[in-house]
Amino acid sequence: MAAIRKKLVIVGDGACGKTCLLIVFSKDQFPEVYVPTVFENYIADIEVDGKQVELALWDTAGQEDYDRLRPLSYPDTDVILMCFSIDSPDSLENIPEKWTPEVKHFCPNVPIILVGNKKDLRQDEHTRRELAKMKQEPVRSEEGRDMANRISAFGYLECSAKTKEGVREVFEMATRAGLQVRKNKRRRGCPIL
C-alpha cells in the first residue's frame, strides 16, 4: 500500500532550532554547527495509528531578509510547525506578532502545532545567567500552552533536538493534525497564490 503524502512547513525566528529539529527527526543526527537556512526539503516516513505517512518537511528561513521568499513554501501545506526557542522569550513574542498573521494569511484553516524548541536549555545555568542580565528568564511551559490557546493551535509540545526528548512526539502530533483533513474537501492545504 502506498504511503499517504503530507506536506509539513516549519516556521519561526532565525536560530530557534527549526533545522536541527527536522534533521534529528529525519536523519537522527544533531548538527553541531549553525548554518542559517535559505530553503531546504527533507523527506521522512512515519507511522501513526497504523497509517504509513510520507512527510515532506519544508524548512524555511526565519530571518527577515527572506520574508518575501518564504511564502513560496506555503502552497498545499497540510500542517504547520510554528517554533520558538525556550531560551528566547523574544522568539515567543514573535509568534503572535509575526508568525501567526503570516501563516493564517497564506494558510487559512491549516492546523498549527506550536513547538517550544531547546527544552534542555530551560535548566541550563549559563542560559539562565545570560537571560537574567536582560531581566528575562527561559519560557515556562504554561506560557507556551497559553500562547497555543491564544493562537488557536492544534496542540503545544516542547522538545530538545539535542537530547532527542519529545522530537518524535512533535512529528506524530503534526502527522495526526495533517491527516484530519475534512473528507468533504478534496484538498484543504494552502491555496496556490
Swiss-Prot record:
Disulfide bonds: none
InterPro entries: P-loop_NTPase, Small_GTP-bd, Small_GTPase, Small_GTPase_Rho
ADP-ribosylasparagine: residues carrying this PTM: 41
Residues spanned by motif Effector region: 34-42
Record flagged with keyword Glycoprotein: yes
PROSITE patterns to which the protein is assigned, alphabetical: RHO (PS51420)
Lipid tethering residues (S-geranylgeranyl cysteine): 190
Assembly description: Interacts with RTKN. Interacts with AKAP13. Interacts with DIAPH1. Interacts with PKN2. Interacts with ROCK1 and ROCK2. Interacts with ARHGDIA. Interacts with RIPOR1.
The name this protein goes by in its record: Rho-related GTP-binding protein RhoC
Gene: RHOC
